[in-house]
From Swiss-Prot:
Record carries keyword Transferase: yes
NCBIfam families on file: PRK00881.1, purH
The keyword Hydrolase is assigned to this record: yes
Family matches, as Pfam families: AICARFT_IMPCHas, MGS
Alphabetical GO biological process terms: 'de novo' IMP biosynthetic process
Listed transmembrane segments: none
Sequence ranges assigned to domain MGS-like in this UniProt record: 1-145
Family label: Belongs to the PurH family.
One GO cellular component, as annotated: cytosol
Identification of the protein by name: Bifunctional purine biosynthesis protein PurH
EC number: 2.1.2.3, 3.5.4.10
Organism: Streptococcus pneumoniae (strain ATCC 700669 / Spain 23F-1)
Length: 515
């Protein structure tokens, strides 16, 4: 009995060669629309789909394969006489191989000028139906959705006259993943169109970007997936120019650093980060000086850390950076001389280019946190804040220099693990106190790190101070200005303590926990 294949593809890469090889093996080819034209033009004989269905393609191609002669040929079980008799009685010929890929919905909606009508028109209906029918009947039918699988199918057909059950099962699993992702992307698009922020069903679509050697620790398996609709300014979109593959921990740290620097868009800025916490942030009129400030913030912790810059790296900055052991450098671009300096002297240094996007993250861009048996979803902590909305709650007003430093500190504290405290001046961090289980311990940690650089320094807290003993520690260190959300039932005690020591204190009204 002659074997039959149905081919209908939007991605025509390799399809002519694949069909030619099938012809050599004696296969009969059914095809549709543009695929048939491409094969016919290449000299590959095909049968038109309407010759099989008895109906013409209609409604601008919306209806062409949704027919019992197609789906009966795909779904008939070869091991059931009743199925085979039904097919024979209804003059349905069996189809043994399906090669289909779908309308380019993703590519369509990524176009900057796409219209809603264009998006809707690129939702494939017949393609997923054929794929699912063939995949369901994988005991008898081979289904191919990815051109990368053409070779293995041809090899098995040439060697054995058929594909193995293991191959058919693997390809069926691939099809169900593919159609599920395709439908999820359509659902995501429509959900966004109607402004639904809390859908009752949540399906996320990601594509495998990089298999990883291991996860956070060597005993943990890991892989890196990228959003099907990529975010421009993200670690997943960065171009690697040098060094080994990024590790699991590299990617997490780099992501954290990129999130931080996105908030420092107005001036040349350098962020140094270690274990998801900033260990140095420097801001200046030029990127070399910003590097100096970031490095001087904590010359010890930066060792083995990640550095991200929001301006092009020049030779002078590269010379300074190459003298420090770093895991990763991320910048919008590098001069040729700077890149040569970094690559020649640091063969394993991971160097990434990521064009800086000064646009702030969208509040509607979700963050996902896995818990056992569930998933927490929240929008990003990108609430727009203005110093004009802040409240000075003490008798003493901040000086102009203190006000600038407080604004700098408030941007930085958002990215310190809670309980988080940070000490800064108006252009660099001086001490970071992250992740302590009581706030006064974080205060002491940040102050101890700042040491003899506290003259003119300010302090920021990611959440309110629960007790007035915190202000005593701060005042004792010589810090004269504090910024915090406020909101404690003991706020008045803290305000009175600040007044007692001659401090100025600002309440922002916004908390920035980070766990």
């Amino acid at each position: 009995m002659t074997k039959r294949v149905l081919i209908s593809v939007s991605d025509k890469a390799g399809i002519v060669e694949f069909a030619q090889e099938l012809k050599k093996l004696g296969w009969e080819i059914i095809s549709t629309g543009g695929t048939k034209v491409a094969l016919d033009n290449a000299g590959v004989d095909t049968i038109a789909i309407d010759d099989v269905t008895g109906f013409p393609e209609m409604m601008d191609g919306r209806v062409k394969t949704l027919h019992p002669n197609i789906h009966g040929g795909l779904l008939a079980r070869r091991d059931l006489d009743s199925h085979l008799e039904a097919a024979k009685d209804n003059k349905i010929e069996l189809i043994d191989l399906v090669v289909v890929n779908l309308y380019p919905f993703k590519e369509t909606i990524l176009k900057p000028d796409v219209t809603y009508a264009d998006a809707v028109e690129n939702i494939d209906i017949g393609g997923p139906s054929m794929l699912r029918s063939a995949a369901k009947n994988h005991a008898s039918v081979t289904v191919v959705v990815d051109p990368a699988d053409y070779a293995v199918v041809l090899d098995e057909l040439a060697a054995n006259g058929e594909t193995s059950y293991e191959t058919r099962q693997r390809l069926a699993a691939k099809v169900f993943r593919h159609t599920a992702a395709y439908d999820a992307l359509i659902a995501e698009y429509f959900t966004a169109q109607v402004g639904e922020s809390k859908p009752e069903k949540l399906t996320l679509t990601y594509d495998l970007k990089q298999p990883m050697r291991y996860g956070e620790n060597p005993q943990q398996d890991a892989d890196f997936y990228q959003k099907a609709l990529p975010t421009d300014y993200s670690i997943a979109s960065a171009k690697q120019l040098n060094g080994k593959e990024l590790s699991f921990n590299n990617i997490r740290d780099a992501d954290a650093a990129i999130r931080i620097i996105r908030d420092f868009k107005d001036s040349p800025t350098v962020v140094a980060l270690k274990h998801m916490n900033p260990c140095g942030i420097g801001q200046a009129d030029d990127i070399e000086t910003a590097w100096d400030y970031a490095y001087e913030s904590d010359p010890v912790s930066i060792f083995g850390g990640i550095v991200v810059l929001n301006r092009e790296v020049d030779a002078a900055t590269a010379e300074k950076m190459h003298g420090v052991f770093l895991e990763i450098i991320i910048a919008p671009s590098y001069t040729d001389e700077a890149l040569a300096i970094l690559i020649n002297k640091k063969k394993n240094l991971r160097i990434l280019a990521l064009p800086f996007n000064a646009q702030e993250a969208s509040e509607v861009e979700a963050e996902y946190t896995g818990v056992v048996g569930g998933l927490l979803v929240q929008n990003q902590d990108v609430v727009k804040e203005s110093p004009a909305d802040w409240q000075v709650v003490t008798k003493r007003q901040p000086t102009e220099t203190e006000a600038t430093a407080l604004e700098f500190a408030w941007k930085a504290i958002k990215y310190v693990k809670s309980n988080g405290i940070i000490v800064t001046n108006d252009h660099m961090t001086l001490g970071v106190g992250p992740g302590q289980t009581n706030r006064v311990a974080s205060v002491r940690l940040a102050i101890d790190q700042a040491k003899d650089r506290l003259n003119g320094a300010v302090l920021a807290s990611d959440a309110f101070f629960p007790f007035a003993d915190n202000v005593e520690e701060i005042a004792k260190a010589g810090i004269k200005a504090i910024i915090q959300p406020g909101g404690s039932v003991r706020d008045q005690e803290f305000i009175e303590a600040a007044d007692k020591y001659g401090l100025t204190m600002v309440f922002t009204g916004v908390r920035h926990f980070r766990h």
